[in-house]
Amino acid sequence: MLRSLTCSSTITSTSLFFRSFRQLPRSYLSPSSSTTVVGASGRNIRRLSTLEAAGRRLFLRRGLKLLSAASRGLNGQFSRLSIRAVATQSAPSSYPGQDEAEKLGFEKVSEEFISECKSKAVLFKHKKTGCEVMSVSNDDENKVFGIVFRTPPKDSTGIPHILEHSVLCGSRKYPMKEPFVELLKGSLHTFLNAFTYPDRTCYPVASTNKKDFYNLVDVYLDAVFFPKCVDDVHTFQQEGWHYELNDPSEDISYKGVVFNEMKGVYSQPDNILGRVTQQALCPENTYGVDSGGDPKDIPKLTFEKFKEFHRQYYHPSNARIWFYGDDDPVHRLRVLSEYLDMFDASPARDSSKVEPQKLFSRPRRIVEKYPAGEDGDLKKKHMVCLNWLLSDKPLDLQTQLALGFLDHLMLGTPASPLRKILLESGLGEALVNSGMEDELLQPQFSIGLKGVSDDNVQKVEELVMNTLRKLADEGFDTDAVEASMNTIEFSLRENNTGSSPRGLSLMLQSIAKWIYDMDPFEPLKYEEPLKSLKARIAEKGSKSVFSPLIEEYILNNPHCVTIEMQPDPEKASLEEAEEKSILEKVKASMTEEDLTELARATEELRLKQETPDPPDALKCVPSLNLSDIPKEPIYVPTEVGDINGVKVLRNDLFTNNILYTEVVFDMGSVKHELLQLIPLFCQSLLEMGTQDLTFVQLNQLIGRKTGGISVYPLTSSVYGRDDPCSKIIVRGKSMVGRAEDLFNLMNCVLQEVRFTDQQRFKQFVSQSRARMENRLRGSGQGIAAARMDAMLNVAGWMSEQMGGLSYLEFLHTLEQKVDQDWEGISSSLEEIRRSFLSRNGCIVNMTADGKSLTNTEKYVGKFLDLLPENPSGELVTWDARLPLRNEAIVIPTQVNYVGKAGNIYSSGYKLDGSSYVISKHISNTWLWDRVRVSGGAYGGSCDFDSHSGVFSFLSYRDPNLLKTLDIYDGTGDFLRGLDVDEDTLTKAIIGTIGDVDSYQLPDAKGYTSLLRHLLNVTDEERQIRREEILSTSLKDFKEFAEAIDSVSDKGVAVAVASQEDIDAANRERSNFFEVKKAAL
């Protein structure tokens, strides 16, 4: 596994409007199986703490998840979805005229050329139903389709969310159990998922292959308009909820994919705060309930209400449809007309309108509890958050842009004043639930702090208000305003949406207004509002622009809700006891005949879930042929040379006049005892000052001159080698004309930053611990994966020390040590720098067009000449591992994260490309059916790290523990009993190639080239693996069973779970787990 640690050390841009998705839309796929967390390669990425695993299959893949240089979000405490314009060529000339559109049943409402994305956009209206269609045409090969319904719920039973899952479980034309999974298996999709927002449900797909794209479109259109689920109670029970009783003598339990997903959500304090915030700000409209579903309310949902919700809202009259890319605009309408013409007009568009929340006349205050562990001082684990609903109606683009700019000025970088003052106050550990939210009908702004002592809650509230008042009175530093403006303009020019298709980002941007019956074109046109904002700042000064916004929308706004979250170590157990009591009463109310019938129904559902679809049904799902697949891998044009004796990789790609660069240093001379300090060392490089610059000035300089700089460690096993690859990478980007500034600032960060600010370092430790604790609760599968890797290979051990449970334990100890031995810590940070900073073994990777690369070489040479010749330390041998054992990590949670792993190379397996096909097939069939569908977990997957030989299984938000491990152990028998036909095998191969050839932006291509070089992955070897993939046979599946058996027999199991479930497991299998309690 290749690992990269972000270390909270990125200084870079986010998006034009700097949206903070504090309550992210729920998606159909879990993070253990979802393309929403898939890197640019299409591979699943395991995140833990500061770790983002990136490139495990470099033999195969063009792309990897962008690491630190991909935006961290405004303050690192909440997630953001970058939405940027796309730089493409002008639109294709073939566009439906009015007559042609009329023949297909559409009228043209409006038409514009959007210069910001160099696209021709036409808004059509289907005359019969009123369905609106945005048809965006350009030369982007990554085609995107999306259909969005307005779906405002009236309660928290989770109807929109359960329906989002269920419509993808078979339809009129595709009557198998889950055509969605068939698409996962055998499509070249670059995006395939679905989202539930608080007031709408989105179904987007994307592909670069035209035939594949329209296959996806047809399956999705049939799924939303003609799903089987409205006539099949079993789908409702499977995806939503049902009573489960295996034997009348046993206890009844709740099961259901969404039910367990939301149990996981309601186990995370940050998520609870986000939901409380939304509901408290908007108690009178649809935002006052949880569209995802509250686990206490989900069992109140009936099948009849479920069916009625679909009938009411899933109608063309209530739909907005988006097309984007280089496909034929006429064909788009032709495909749509076949579906839309089957419907008449409906009042759904009127009945689904979201009513605005009326503004409060005075502020309100709410106190809520959240589940906490028993360890530590609970009095210091409060959270406090101030929240404002900014307006009683949507804002115009000009005001929205100005508020987004203001948001970035206040919170966007470590040097931003509101963020800086709160974190330096000592009143809390990290920001939480903070930033501007403008994706819903009415915009919101929040600022919160976690790790607050109970006697400091009032002080935090006062500090927030006093700081906002001071900012309104005094304004912002000129350099800060310039840095923010450069950040915005760089972001718009770069158009970097990471692994998400650009057309999807534009769709989500457009739909945020369109869904409320506003102009869908307006959000795509930023040039004039930005030009106007810059002119206002230049003419009147930034204070006259931003101070009135602070006054009007925050300080003088009575619609403010202050939320205090208090830790409650008994909350989780009380909720479990309450659920158990409800189920006991349900059972007590049943007769013997009722219980027998429930046990029969439980078995009936299980049999249906575990019975495969007949081959004829599977053939209904359209798919590609192997003849559609290129026989050769995609190559990155990389030239290896040197500058002043240092190796330089040049990736000649069009980047829209942007230079991307990585400078790589070897960690081989860093002492073992300093390893765990490296993430904090990386953060310190970017968030401490120099002799001449404060850290604020340094941050502003980076913001003004570049598109961002990040520093992070990277570790990976290397195929065929015992010693791991361990590097420290400095990554940056700038306009080509600013290349000299970029390399000067990189040099400044590496050589001039001083480790003298004790209080700032203490903040880093507290912030890192808070992030780790949040990830342990919400991404336990990543923690489990890291522990298993640390037991099985050296690179895994190194990574876990810097980003897993061991790192969290280290942070707890370090917090005390900062006060006791700061001089020693400061000296250790300096020693780390001396140990790796050297020209010797350094590699520079650059990505831009050839001319720009040539023009940049002189700045690279100057940078390299300033580096020390040799590192100060001697080479260190890394050979540590965690002891092999089955381990259970206790956290306060209502769901579990269950893993098992083993090294199949150790058992004699020789790498073959077929292993990638087989691994994907296991995830999409055996584990999907048994762990998710039958078991009720939100996700289950497997992963093969071809660099180390570690094969691992993971589940996510799982109600089970030992049962899931038994499923993993049955994988070998599953493979031996497999009887796949040619179509199924072809789908598995094509789906794997889809991962291998997934779409990449230029910076990701250049970064992938670097990683392949570091891990000795040649193009010749990639060709061999590709040929092995394409020639995979049933015999390969059978033979791989033996390798999987070694995981069952000799592997290690790690579970992140509740104390109750771990105790039950150890009772059932005497002392199966060694128990380790996480300090939360």
Swiss-Prot record:
GO process annotations (BP): protein processing
Catalytic residues (UniProt): 164, 239
Gene Ontology terms for molecular function: metal ion binding; metallopeptidase activity
Cofactor binding description: Binds 1 zinc ion per subunit.
Cofactor(s) needed: Zn(2+); Mg(2+)
Residues noted as binding Zn(2+) in the record, renumbered to the chain: 161, 165, 261
The protein's role, per its UniProt record: ATP-independent protease that degrades both mitochondrial and chloroplastic transit peptides after their cleavage. Also degrades other unstructured peptides. Specific for peptides in the range of 10 to 65 residues. Shows a preference for cleavage after small polar residues and before basic residues, but without any positional preference.
Record's protein name: Presequence protease 2, chloroplastic/mitochondrial
Source species: Arabidopsis thaliana
